[in-house]
Amino acid sequence: MGNHMNKHIAALTVACLAATSANAAGLPERVKSAGKVVVANQPNYPPMEYVDPATNELKGVDIDLGVALAKELGTTVEWSNISFEQMISSLQTGRVDLIHSGMSDLPKRRDTLDFIDYMKSGAQFYTSFARKDEFKTLTDFCGKTVGMSRRTSFPDETAKWSAANCEAKGLPAIKVVGTEGSADARAQLKQGRLDAAVQGSETLPYLMDLEKDTYAVVGEPFTVVYQGIGFAKKDTELRDAYAAALKGLMESGEYKAIFAKYGLEGTLLDGIHINGEAVK
């Protein structure tokens, strides 16, 4: 069922990508008449989205990409600051047109959303700079207290990794602590209440540059996931317009330039992906 549905989506999207005149003509009537797309975003996940303390302006990869996509489509963006937990319900009730806020394209979310994927990410262990010598390999985290945002997929993914790599080998399980967000996990790490934390791999270089000699990444990401722009299942017209717009940005080089600005060239995707599958 899932594969059949993805093939159906891919076929629809191929048709839209063939006509890459990604302009307002491909947008739903409601967006054309409004002259804007209303986008759910919570700016608390640098460098993906954050508020610049100096100017109070929104900044980040998602912000730059969202503005560029809207421009490609001949419209504008109205960012709607919505808590992560409320984003999907806000989309379903029509309060927003789409979600663009560092959201992982997870199979369980595809029951209610279609995703246009735009970057690779992964769950990454890190610890405090002062304790970096204690953790040489990922199994050194077995039996340790590790924090991560409870609103993300990281707690489940970390528990799964622990079961396969700690408990299955006779090592103590990781003690997974769900925190109020990634900033809370970092605060608890600094206070010594956590031995380590887990966060999206795309955010850590930015944080390590911002707070030098504070954190240390250990090993490689232990999951691979795509970040995606989320659309209501019924909103195929808007989804396909955005897929065409993203293809246009990829071909012009603007997509790559946005990610290069934040040092995230390693997270780029090669071509359009819908719900985790490449669209030819």
Model feature map: region roles:
Residues 25-102, 252, 261:
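Extracytoplasmic small-molecule ligand-binding "clamshell" domains
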Residues 28, 58-62, 109-120, 216-219, ...:
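A structural signal for short loop-to-beta-strand junctions that line the ligand-binding cleft
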Residues 41-45, 80-85, 94-106, 121, ...:
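Beta->alpha turn/N-cap motifs
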Residues 85-86, 103-110, 156-162, 190-224:
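A ligand-binding cleft/hinge motif common to bilobed small-molecule-binding domains
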Residues 68-72, 80-81, 85-98, 112-113, ...:
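Short helices/loops that flank or line small-molecule/ion binding pockets
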Residues 128-146:
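Flexible hinge/capping segments at coil-to-helix
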Residues 67-73, 154-178, 208-212:
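Ligand-binding cleft/hinge of the Venus flytrap
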Residues 43, 120-127, 209-246, 265-280:
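Periplasmic-binding protein-like
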